[in-house]
Amino acid sequence: KEKKILSGHFSNTDGNVFAIITPRQVDRGALMSRYSRTDKSMRRIFLDEFLKNENRGEEFYDRVLLEYGDDSVAELGEAQIAIEGLSNIAVKKIEDRRIGLSYLEKSSRYVAWNKKENGRYRFYRDPEIKKSKFADMYEETCTFSFEVYSKNIEPMINYVREKYPIEKYSFKDSKDKKEKLFSKLKNEADIKSANMIYRGSTKAKALDILRGLLPASTLTNVGITGNGRAFEYLLTVLSSSELKEEQELASKIKKELETTIKSFVRRADDKYGKAFQKYLKDVKNKSRSITSKKIKSNPTKGAITKIVDYESEKNAIDKIITSIMYEQSPSTSYQNILQQVKKISKQEKIKIIQEFTKLRTNRRHRPSRAFENVYYTFDLCNNFGMFRDFHRHRALTLERQLLTTDHGYSIPNEIKILGIENDFKDAMNKTKDTFETIRKKYPEQSQYVVNFAYNYPYFMKFNLREACHLIELRTVPQGHVDYRRVAQQMFQQINKVHPVLSQIMKFVDMKEYDLERFESEKRTEEKRKKLK
């Protein structure tokens, strides 16, 4: 009888490894947490304590979290939520959270953002601006940006297809499995498949080129998976924001999380949560106050990718080799190993680094943690659209400023060639005028009107292991041309200051590509065929 009951809550009833499949997240987390405080098996705990009391999980968490403040147990329950129709300002604030949450956001590459709702383009209309004298100006500026974007989608797709005709590319012939030019394909299914690959990659290219026109108010969707502790912190951060949108999102997210992991997020708005919100506001205000007295504004125009902090390669190599040897060393301290490593000849040290470089046979073979001991800081100012891609990397320190029009914007060459440079500049100039007018009274809300093409200042500090992951990933052929170039510049600058250590980044692609998505679309189509 017990086995029958357990089968609905655990993947098996007698093995020593099993999945917890009981429906309620709060019970799953409470079972794991309770597990650490008894010598009973988890299935026994479930039968003895949870089966007869459907509120047992919540009661347990209320006691542990509220009475003892044991934060770590809030990591044992997870939830998945979807947020639709939030701005690109709010989604970046959410995605600033690095630990315990995973995100998947609507793409600006695969989806055109030209749809209207009730006759209006889909962008966020901030309530503070809506009730101000700037309401019409804001509406007109965002609408104009969308109009220029929307009316040029088809012309840009046509231009891309003219510049990169399908006849120029090779596709797989299903009969002999060889790559052949499009004109040489005979099989109807192969021709259809080739057209699908070509249409997908050319549309992606066109949308990549045009995305700079989109304002930060553009509405997007994001899915989030995370644990209770991380969600609680997210709610605290959003609640402390000066933006109404982010405050309202905090309330909506909390309401929905209460349907699945209520006990984990209860404290986000209690007296401790309110105190934490006040602390976050105080930190921001104190920083703003000190900065206004000590730092003079000095905005630079144009894009920047510059390494500004690093250590000597000699010291860096010693640290990495010490860490490589630490795990396998015979009961020897880090300090002692370091002293011994310093006595190894330079050539021997280079050879050691090269040995570990040889072991990597693809980019997913990450360097070991030893390579986390060396750091680089980059001063960056790139278009906001590109920043959104780099922002996804979280195993690093990233600080960023408010989005403004102070640093100029980038124009893709294709915009000029297609003959829409004037339209593009008109949109940028209109944005700048509106932004400058609104920012005096609403410095935070004025961000919404700024286009993705405008340059955005931030800095990133990361270790060599993360540099390897970030740069190799962001230089893959299918990447957006903007972030590929920045990642390539990062590699060149690291290579200049650390020519030996940078060898570990052996899968950096320094080439330029016509249709970035083409080869990737081909691989996807091959996989699709195998699934049929």
Residue ranges and their predicted role:
Residues 1-532:
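A conserved ligand/cofactor-binding region detector
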